[in-house]
Amino acid sequence: MSKGAAIIAYANPIFHIRHLKLESFLWNIIIRAIVHNVSSPQRHSPISVYLRMRNHRVSPDFHTFPFLLPSFHNPLHLPLGQRTHAQILLFGLDKDPFVRTSLLNMYSSCGDLRSAQRVFDDSGSKDLPAWNSVVNAYAKAGLIDDARKLFDEMPERNVISWSCLINGYVMCGKYKEALDLFREMQLPKPNEAFVRPNEFTMSTVLSACGRLGALEQGKWVHAYIDKYHVEIDIVLGTALIDMYAKCGSLERAKRVFNALGSKKDVKAYSAMICCLAMYGLTDECFQLFSEMTTSDNINPNSVTFVGILGACVHRGLINEGKSYFKMMIEEFGITPSIQHYGCMVDLYGRSGLIKEAESFIASMPMEPDVLIWGSLLSGSRMLGDIKTCEGALKRLIELDPMNSGAYVLLSNVYAKTGRWMEVKCIRHEMEVKGINKVPGCSYVEVEGVVHEFVVGDESQQESERIYAMLDEIMQRLREAGYVTDTKEVLLDLNEKDKEIALSYHSEKLAIAFCLMKTRPGTPVRIIKNLRICGDCHLVMKMISKLFSREIVVRDCNRFHHFRDGSCSCRDFW
C-alpha cells in the first residue's frame, strides 16, 4: 500500500474522534493524499475532510488551501470553490502567493475567467506563478490574443510561461503561430536568461509539427531531445510517433515505436495502430493488435478500437469491422463511444449498405450527433442517394446550423445529378445565413519553412513561376494521356471553364511549387484540409510516375502514398 493510500485508509471518523489534537499539518497531508489519489475508491471527499477538520476546531494554514483547491476542476465544482474562497478570506490567507495561485488555477479550471482575472488584479505583487496561471487560463479558454497580450506584459518568463502559450496556440488550431513562438523562445533576449524547453513544450511543438506536416522542424525537435539526453518516455514517444506519421514519415514513426522496447503500453500501441490505419495498412494494424493483446498481454482501450475500426473503414472490410466491434464489447468490456458508432456508420455507408447504416443508428443507446449524421451523409453522397442525404442534412442542421460541410456535401450531390436549381437554392441559403464554405488549403514544407496554398492562390511571392510550372506539368500529363475529370467540378460551367477551375486546386499549386523548389527525386509531402478530389488524385498518380517522385498526401480522411503511378489507397477513399 502506498503512503498516500495508507493515509486515506486511516482517514475515517474513528481516527478523527480518537485524535482530537491533530494539528493542521496532518490534516493537510490527509487532504493532499485524497486529492492525489483520485483514481482510488474513497469514502471521503477532500472537502468533507476539511469540514471535519474545522469541526475539531483546527484552523487551516497557508498549506491547506493549495492542497484542497485542485479538487475543484470543472464548472460543476464552482460553487464549492467559491465557498472555499470565502474560507480563505475569513482566515486572511488570500495574500499568500501559493494560495493566490491555487485560486487562479481553480477558477480557470472551473471556467470562471472573470473571477480568475479579479484574483489576479487584486494581487499586490504579482509573482511569476500568478502570471503563468492567468496566461494559461486565457489560453485554455481559447482567448489566445488576450493570453498573448498578458504574456507580452510579463516582467519575466520561464519555461512554463512559454509552454502555456505554445499549447494555447495548438489548442486553437494556430499551429504556425505555435511554431513561430517556439522559434522565438530559442532566440537570445537582452536581460533574460535562456529558457530550455521541457518535455511538455516539446510534445506540444511536435503536435503542431504533425498538424502542419512540418517534418524538418519535427526532426529538429527530435534531434534536440537526443542532444540533451532527454528521456523519451511514453508521452514524448507517443508524440514523436504521432508527429512522424502525420508528416508522412511512417518508417521513422515505426523506429520510435520499436525503440520504446519494454516501455510500450496501451497508449503507444494505440498511437501506432491509429497511424497504420491512417495509411490504410490494415493487415499491419491487425497484426500489431494481435501482438499487443497476446505477446505483450496488454488490453486495448477505446482509442485502440477507434484505430482498428478506422482501418476497416479505409479498406471497406465490413465483416472484420463488425467482428472487432463485437470483440470490443464482449471480450474487453469496452462500452462503445460515439466515435466507435461513427466508424461503423461510415463503414456501412462506404460499403453501400445505407439501410444497414440507418438501422445501426436506430439501435444506438445514445442520441446520434454531428459525427453520426455526417458519416451517413458522406456515405449516401458517394452512392448518390439524394433522399438519405437530405434526411441526414436536416438532422445535421438541427444539431449544428452553421455546419458548412453539410451544405456543401448535399450541394455536391445535386450538382453531380445536374440539379443546378437546388444547388443555387443551397448556396443562397448559405449566403443568407452567413455560412462560408471552407476553402481548399494545402501545406508543404521546403527547407524548414511551411508554405500555405489555397485554391486559385496568387499571394505567393513567386506566383507567376508557380503557375508557369503548373502549366508545364499539365502539358506533360496531357501528352501522356491525361484527360481532365470535369465531373469533379460541381459548378454550372462550360467544359473549358471547368478545366481551368480544376487546374488551380491547392494541392496542384503545392506540387508545382515543390517540383520547382526541390531536387529531382526528393519526396513531396502535402497536407490537405479537405478530401482530395478524383482529378487531383489522378494528377498525383501520373506525376509520381512521369517525374519519378514519391508523393505523400494527407487529406482530411487518410494518407495517400503515390509511387510509380499508383496510390496506397487503391483508389478507395
Curated annotation (Swiss-Prot):
A GO term for molecular function: RNA binding
Annotated region (Type E motif), positions in chain: 372-447
Top-rank lineage group of the source organism: Eukaryota
PPR repeat start and end residues: 23-60, 61-95, 96-126, 127-161, 162-188, 198-232, 233-263, 265-295, 301-336, 337-367
Keywords: Repeat
Parts of the chain that traverse the membrane: none
Chain spans, region Type DYW motif: 479-573
GO BP terms in the entry: RNA modification
Keyword Protease: no
Listed name of the protein: Pentatricopeptide repeat-containing protein At3g62890
Provenance organism: Arabidopsis thaliana (Mouse-ear cress)
